[in-house]
C-alpha cells in the first residue's frame, strides 16, 4: 500500500527489453534506498513494482506486457524521470489517501492554467464510464500523487497544485498532451459500485 505522498523523482538509467516483459533500471537517491531489499514494493508513477535487483544506486524492476500496455511506463525512455514512493510501513503518517498502486486507466493533460502561487491542470479521461468515480472534492491519484479533485466537466476534471507538489513531483514538468496514470479512490469505487448494483437489483 502507498499514501500518495511522492518522495521525489528518479531517472530511468536503462531499459532492457526481454521476451514478454521489460526490465527497467532506476537510479535512486540514498534516502530512497534506505533499508531497501529485493522483493520490496516501490511505486513508479503510481505503479506498484517489485524490486528485482539492487546494484549500488541502481534498482531494477520487471514490468509485464499488461503493465506496459495500460500505464504510461510503456512509453518512458532512458533519461526520463518517474515519481517514486516507497511502500508504507506500520505507523506511517497517511498524508494523502490509501493507494494500491494498481492503475485504473490513463488520462491526457488537456490544459494547464498557471497563476502566481499554484497551477491548475485539466485531464481528459478515455471514457465517460470512468467519470462516475471522479467526484468534486474527492480523491484521485495522478502518477501516484494523492490529489483532491477541484472541478468535473463531462469527461474532464482538474486539480490545483501548490509549489511543493510541482517541485517534488513530475507535475512541475508536465505539458499539455502528456499521458498520466490514474488510480481512482478505492472507497469511492466501492460506494459507487455498491449503489449502482443495488439500484440495478431494484430495476431503477
Swiss-Prot record:
Where does the source fall among the domains of life? Bacteria
Q: Which PANTHER family match?
A: RIBOFLAVIN SYNTHASE (PTHR21098:SF0), RIBOFLAVIN SYNTHASE ALPHA CHAIN (PTHR21098)
Its pathway is: Cofactor biosynthesis; riboflavin biosynthesis; riboflavin from 2-hydroxy-3-oxobutyl phosphate and 5-amino-6-(D-ribitylamino)uracil: step 2/2
* Source organism: Haemophilus influenzae (strain ATCC 51907 / DSM 11121 / KW20 / Rd)
Q: Which Pfam families match?
A: Lum_binding (PF00677)
Per UniProt, the keywords (alphabetical) are:
Repeat, Riboflavin biosynthesis, Transferase
Read off the SUPFAM superfamilies from this record.
Riboflavin synthase domain-like (SSF63380)
- What is the role of this chain? Catalyzes the dismutation of two molecules of 6,7-dimethyl-8-ribityllumazine, resulting in the formation of riboflavin and 5-amino-6-(D-ribitylamino)uracil.
Source species taxonomy? Bacteria, Pseudomonadati, Pseudomonadota, Gammaproteobacteria, Pasteurellales
Q: Which reaction does it catalyse?
A: 2 6,7-dimethyl-8-(1-D-ribityl)lumazine + H(+) = 5-amino-6-(D-ribitylamino)uracil + riboflavin
Task: Please list the residue ranges covered by the Lumazine-binding repeats.
Answer: 1-97, 98-195
Q: Which GO terms describe its biological process?
A: riboflavin biosynthetic process
This entry's Enzyme Commission designation comes to: 2.5.1.9
User: Any idea what this protein is called?
Assistant: Riboflavin synthase
Give one GO molecular function term.
riboflavin synthase activity
**Positions that bind 2,4-dihydroxypteridine 2:** 48-50, 62-67, 101-103, 137
Q: Which PROSITE patterns match?
A: LUMAZINE_BIND
Subunit structure of this entry? Answer: Homotrimer.
Amino acid at each position: 500500500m502507498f499514501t500518495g505522498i511522492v518522495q521525489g523523482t528518479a531517472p530511468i538509467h536503462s531499459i532492457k527489453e526481454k521476451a514478454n516483459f521489460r526490465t527497467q533500471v532506476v537510479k535512486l537517491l540514498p534516502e530512497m534506498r534506505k533499508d531497501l531489499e529485493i522483493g520490496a514494493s516501490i511505486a513508479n508513477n503510481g505503479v506498484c513494482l517489485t524490486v528485482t535487483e539492487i546494484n549500488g544506486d541502481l534498482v531494477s524492476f520487471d514490468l509485464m506486457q499488461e503493465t506496459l500496455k495500460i500505464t504510461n511506463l510503456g512509453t518512458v525512455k532512458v533519461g526520463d524521470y518517474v515519481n517514486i514512493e516507497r511502500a508504507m510501513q506500520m505507523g506511517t503518517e497517511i498524508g494523502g489517501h490509501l493507494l494500491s498502486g494498481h492503475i485504473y486507466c490513463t488520462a491526457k493533460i488537456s490544459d494547464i492554467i498557471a497563476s502566481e502561487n499554484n497551477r491548475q491542470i485539466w485531464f481528459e479521461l478515455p471514457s465517460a464510464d470512468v467519470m462516475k468515480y471522479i467526484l468534486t472534492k474527492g480523491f484521485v491519484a495522478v502518477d501516484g500523487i494523492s490529489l483532491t479533485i477541484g472541478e468535473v466537466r463531462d469527461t474532464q476534471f482538474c486539480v490545483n497544485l501548490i509549489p511543493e507538489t510541482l517541485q517534488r513531483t513530475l507535475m512541475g514538468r508536465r505539458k499539455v498532451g502528456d499521458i498520466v496514470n490514474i488510480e481512482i479512490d478505492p472507497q469511492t469505487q466501492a460506494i459507487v459500485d455498491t449503489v449502482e448494483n443495488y439500484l440495478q437489483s431494484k430495476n431503477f
